[in-house]
Amino acid sequence: HCIIGIERNKPECIDLLTSLTREMKGVEVKGLPMRYPQGAEKTLVETCTGREVPQVGPSGKPGLPADVGCVIMNVTSVSTLGKFLKTGIPLVTKRVTVEGDAIARPQNIEVPIGTLYRDVIDACGGVKEGVELGKIIFGGPMMGGAAPSADFPVLKQNNGLLLFSKKAAALPEPSACIRCGRCIEACPMGLEPVVIAQDFANKDFAALKARCVDLCVACGSCTYACPAKRPVSQTMGLAKGWYMAELRKGGK
């Protein structure tokens, strides 16, 4: 059974794909709730099938969609697979969204994998006149990472390039945690970032295991919700990284 999940704020896309797949047995187009991060694979599995991916799979490692009989594929992967079966040509180009307040001509552009960010930026008119470039983000605004320079290549997993001016890229000054719990409310996986941060500071492996730190999907919702402007998502990433490293070493 194949389920094509599309957020409900794209009704034309839902109608089109429903029409195109009407005669296909075992194919269902499903409208999904408009909430972030709806595209996370574990969220998709639960929304589309009602199945919950376990924290720990049969192998003893973190659970995967396959543990509940599901395979998640994004649109690009499915399209590329179809083209490969027809032509034998693998994934050699990537569609990249170039956006931000510092880019002259924001647009979607298809480029060969390996193209330098610098060349992609030039193809979009370069940096706006009179604007000082502050930061280049590869990926989206919530989960993307900062590039040290424009001399980095587009990889197959890159789907966005954001250019921010120095003003837009300026980081807010963090203040002390006020323990308001908004990071807990924002977490789609039901984690407790404020508690996990303390467990990580104490390097408490057992506590991090009990708090299910390995379920973090790095969506950035906790940082976005934090009124104290603390780098909560980065701390979660460090905590998960440390926990997984200890787990590989046989930590208990």
Enumerate the predicted regions with their spans:
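Short, surface-exposed connector motifs at secondary-structure boundaries
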Residues: 1-2, 101-104, 222
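Flexible, glycine/charged-enriched surface loops at secondary-structure junctions
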Residues: 1-7, 29, 93, 129-139, ...
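Structured core elements
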Residues: 3, 97, 108-110, 137, ...
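Hydrophobic alpha-helical positions that pack around
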Residues: 6-117, 123-130
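Acidic, glycine-rich active-site loops and adjacent beta-strand->loop/helix elements
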Residues: 8-10, 140-143, 242-243
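Conserved active-site and cofactor/substrate-binding residues in soluble primary-metabolism enzymes
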Residues: 12, 72-80, 93, 112-115, ...
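Active-site gating/interface segments in enzymes
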Residues: 37-38, 45-49, 86-88, 126-178
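Ferredoxin-type iron-sulfur electron-transfer modules in oxidoreductases and energy-metabolism complexes
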Residues: 160-174, 184, 188-224, 228-252
